[in-house]
Amino acid sequence: MIVQLRRVLALAGAGLLTLVSACESQKPKYEGPYAAEVAQAVPMIEKAVGLKFKTPPKIETRSKEQVREFVTKQFTDSLAKHDIAGQEAAYKRLGMIPDTLKLQPFLTSLLEEQIVGYYDPHTKVLYVVDGSPKDMAQLTITHELVHALQDQYISLDSVQKIRDDNDRLSAAQSVFEGQAVYEQISIMLGGSNIAINLPGGWDRIREMIRENQSSMPIFAAAPKVIQETLIFPYLSGAEFYR
């Protein structure tokens, strides 16, 4: 898969899970939006991952319009346009997408549907979309804070800038997303891996993630190759990390 597309699809992690948090609330010690959610998640993430935040994570809100601008911007530089045009041509030649499908606007709409929040390694800020349901915002914060912690030890920005080596980029993205998904699930289960490790437990969680994705209209209408490209780093990455 193309470098630029994989980089943008990495932003969609918050839309992958709808499990209910069993974590106990803690006294907030952070300021700004979602201070209570951040204060609750940080110590659990540090315990699960085994690393401490070097600096407090930053979190801000973004309007849906700002998210659309951000997503659109990822496709507008000359290299991105060239990559997407080539990928679209290859998909059509192989019969993987309809001849009438325009990949760039479709991906923009798909990502808008998926994104509840994202961590930007360039600004070092976790962004949550205004008006997001509370449960989804909590899941987003937990997942993306894992990325914020990863970024304090390994530069995620440098990984996202990998060029001309899609296999390397895909492997790195799957490791980062896989850890975030797996630790998020563990935290949602109260810090226990019992349900994950029970016979059939992990398979059921994978099914739940796929079912949730399929409930989203644009994702459900997407060609199979786009669906699998979107979901691969999360499911297969978590399987590897497990």
Model-inferred region functions:
Residues 55-74, 163-167, 198-207:
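Acidic helix-start/capping segments at beta-turn-to-alpha-helix junctions
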Residues 24-26:
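Bacterial signal peptide processing site
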Residues 126-141, 171-172:
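Short pre-active-site segment immediately N-terminal to the catalytic Zn-binding motif
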Residues 19-22:
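C-terminal motif of bacterial Sec signal peptides marking the signal peptidase cleavage site
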Residues 151-157, 161-209:
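Post-HExxH zinc-binding segment in Zn-dependent metallohydrolases
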Residues 45, 139-156, 180-181:
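Active-site recognition of the HExxH zinc-binding catalytic motif
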Residues 69-82, 102-123:
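Catalytic zinc-binding patch centered on the HExxH motif and its immediate surroundings
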Residues 179, 188-190, 210-242:
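Active-site-proximal alpha-helical
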